[in-house]
Swiss-Prot record:
Belongs to the SIP5 family. This is Protein SIP5. Residues 21-32, 51-69 have a biased composition (Polar residues). Residues 1-84, 419-489 are annotated as: Disordered. Interacts with NPA1, SNF1 and REG1. The gene is SIP5. Disulfide bonds: none annotated. It is found in: Cytoplasm. The lineage of its organism: Eukaryota, Fungi, Dikarya, Ascomycota, Saccharomycotina.
């Protein structure tokens, strides 16, 4: 029924046909030798195929001690990534209780969520340490003719965060289900292919995360408005700040006093990139001393991993990216958006006339003073340069991951290519056809064929490739471990 006979069966068949065979003794021995070679070839092919599979599977799961990742492990990894994205989104919620010098620790929302891929913890720490300007609530325009009362009234009406578009076309007709449930597998159409189900899962997750961000920010907005109303109701104004006759401690609402509102916006300026009006002081580019708001600064980052842009020689054949060495992948530091100087960095000098919020006095206790407030340490602040790499410390990890991905793809292509050379159906058909017709003629003409690498040579080549990939992977893991150790505080 098409099964390949075993060696014992082969010998029995030879014994049965030998009395009626028309071949001479030399011819019979030649046929037996050919069958033995085919059986040995099948063993080598199975061994080589196993080696190919080991290379293919090993490159995809080298960090695991087992042979391959189970489906449960893959789902767990995917879920961990989703939880990390949710945690990052929560860090971007503007909270009225998290203020520094009249600004906030999270962005107002001038740019889309997808562009806010910086390390939120690093940025918050820089703002708290006053090494980076906080995220201020911007004004669309500013008129110098505004009086104090007019300016305070305008600032008092500013929202905590920019408004969301609740009906994005991207998420139209995408089911989100119950947001309180952690899973949503019941929303996925099981009649779709596995690939389409994964795409649908990713789209539903993005839609759910977008809706969650709206709800999280709306909750903070409600708290913000409630505190405003409560402050007005109890008559907590800047003129009554110095009244300390009551022994009962006053509640901290984390809201700016009228004096702080006026101080913030009366001497603000426009950001040259987004053209919005922000309070000062600004961040300044170290190279050309141009102002830039923090909303715009966190958008600037390194280029995505790519191969060097070599000059194209028309006389030389162009090399495809898939054929290039993955170790050549690079990612240049960001350039200055004003003067295009390489390795863009900014400096920030915090205000000396106000220090409120975290690390300072309560924002609603601030009283305007013409003279600058001297610092407690009596000296100038420690000004340090901040780069895009500072707020995205994982850029090198991402670069190495992309290199490893290209290495795996290249290794897979190499293994498949070698496997195809070892297991060539057309070659087998030609060999079997020639055997069935004239086995002796095949022996006489095989020497005239062009020389090809032997099975053992190809196996040795694959072993060397597997060893090389293993050493590269081990070296990358060692570098990543050392880098993570050095990044720990």
């Amino acid at each position: 029924m098409g099964n390949v006979p075993g060696k014992i069966d082969q010998e029995d068949s030879f014994n049965d046909v030998r009395p009626d065979s028309s071949y001479n003794t030399t011819s019979s021995n030649s046929v037996i030798k050919q069958y033995d070679e085919e059986a040995s070839s099948r063993v080598r092919t199975r061994r080589t195929t196993s080696l190919v599979n080991n290379i293919l599977n090993g490159n995809n799961a080298r960090t695991k001690t087992g042979s391959h990742l189970s489906s449960t492990s893959r789902r767990k990894t995917s879920r961990e990534k989703e939880l990390a994205k949710e945690a990052h989104a929560k860090q971007l919620v503007v909270r009225c209780s998290e203020t520094v010098d009249g600004g906030f620790l999270a962005p107002f929302g001038c740019y889309s969520f997808e562009k806010l891929d910086y390390d939120a913890t690093v940025v918050k720490n820089l703002i708290i340490k006053r090494k980076l300007a906080p995220f201020y609530t911007p004004l669309q325009d500013f008129d110098e003719s505004w009086t104090r009362d007019e300016l305070i009234k305008i600032v008092d009406g500013l929202p905590l965060h920019d408004t969301f578009d609740e009906n994005l076309e991207e998420f139209e007709d995408v089911p989100i289900g119950n947001l309180r449930k952690s899973t949503f597998n019941e929303l996925i159409d099981k009649s779709l292919s596995k690939k389409e189900q994964r795409r649908m899962h990713a789209k539903i997750f993005r839609a759910r995360l977008y809706k969650k961000r709206i709800l999280w920010q709306e909750n903070e907005n409600e708290t913000f408005l409630e505190r405003k109303l409560e402050m007005k109701r109890i008559g907590s104004k800047s003129s009554n700040v110095e009244d300390n006759t009551s022994s009962q401690p006053r509640k901290n609402y984390h809201l700016p006093s009228d004096d702080l509102k006026y101080t913030l916006y009366k001497n603000g300026s426009e950001c040259p990139i987004c053209f919005l009006y922000f309070p000062g002081p600004f961040n300044y580019s170290k190279c050309c001393q141009q102002p830039i708001c923090t909303e715009c600064f966190v958008q600037i980052k390194r280029a995505d991993p790519h191969f060097p842009h070599d000059e194209v020689d028309p006389t030389e054949p162009q090399t495809n990216d898939s054929e290039k060495d993955p170790n050549l992948l690079t990612s240049e530091p960001a350039n200055c958006p004003y003067c295009a100087t390489a390795s863009f960095s900014i400096t920030y000098q915090p205000p000396t006339n106000r220090e409120t919020g975290i690390g300072g006095m309560p924002a609603d206790s601030y009283v305007y003073k013409d003279a600058a407030i001297s610092r407690a340490d009596g000296g100038q602040p420690n000004i340090s340069a901040i780069t895009s790499d500072t707020i995205r410390p994982d850029w090198e990890i991402k670069l190495n991951k992309e290199r490893a991905r290209l290495m795996r793809r290249s290794a897979n292509a190499t293994a498949i290519h070698i496997s195809n050379r070892l297991i060539d159906p057309s070659h087998s058909r030609r060999r079997n056809t020639s055997h069935s017709i004239t086995p002796i003629h095949d022996e006489s003409t095989s020497a005239s064929r062009s020389p090809e690498p032997t099975i053992n040579e190809l196996e040795d080549q694959m072993v060397r490739e597997a060893i090389r990939l293993s050493l590269e992977d081990q070296d990358n893991r060692k570098k990543s471990k050392n880098r993570n150790t050095s990044l720990r505080p």
